[in-house]
Amino acid sequence: MGASLSLVPVLDYFARREFLAAGLRPSAVTLPYPDGGAGATCTVHYWAPPGEPRLPPLLLVHGFGPRATWQWRCQVGPLSRHFHVIVPDLLGFGGTTYPSHAAAPPPSEATQAATLAALLDALPGMEGKRVAAAGTSYGGFVTYWLARAAGSGRVGPVVIASSDLLKTAADDRGFLKRAGEGWSSVDEILLPAEPAAMRKLLELASYRPPPRPMTPDFMLRDFIQKLFTENRERLVHLLKGITVGTDKFEVTPISQDVLIVWGDHDQLFPLEKAFAVQRSLNGSARLEVIKKTGHAPQLEDPARFNKVMLDFLLAAHKSQA
């Protein structure tokens, strides 16, 4: 009986309820696919309030992991009181689709950013309108690329959360060392196939990972099946598209106001990388470290995360008014 219990639909329900209560509604739009041939398209699923913006627009970009609704569920309520919040599923995640693997290369951060720019232009009342943007983890890579490519006239201010823009192969080796013995690759943990790998991912990503009695193997297998196994081929394809750490992803200062947010116990991207990212932006970015949180401070201490983010965004908006 226990093995038939699935928490995934329950978590989906509560996350969707937070979005609906914040006034956001699910929708989708078909757009030209940036890396496809003539006539290639992608379908982008997103959440946003209906109609044209009555408040300043804010784009929230999820990371490489569970659904966007899970990752931003604690933010949409407080943020929607001040901003027209737009939460897309990136290419290959959630309800967003792109051409088959055989027809197109895996989308890079640049491709993801170009798709988001096209989405913004396609939304009611958004063409050419300046939008604030925030991204977490992999979503921070995409947000940085979008801000740099679009420029400050289109995108800004910018929030980069738990996102090592300077990640290298040495960082991957450090990650495996922190994980302990028995792991041969980062992907083995980031795309878990067994309960032990899922438990290790939770341990590394969280300041207070759930105790083992609360994460029995049957429950973790269900999460693995629904979040990873059913989508494994696509997720592996997406990982191959990541260009951070290569000469295709060069970090240079951008003209927008930037807030960097990091958990002090992040074991995926350790805190020292936050200071390195800040230096790479000529030290002009503001850095906020949220204590007693790991890789997802927006979920582990949403009250603090939301205050830091709102203070920054509202001050930036006021200075532009």
Where is each model-derived feature located?
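Flexible "cap/lid" loop of the alpha/beta hydrolase fold
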Residues: 141-148, 153-193
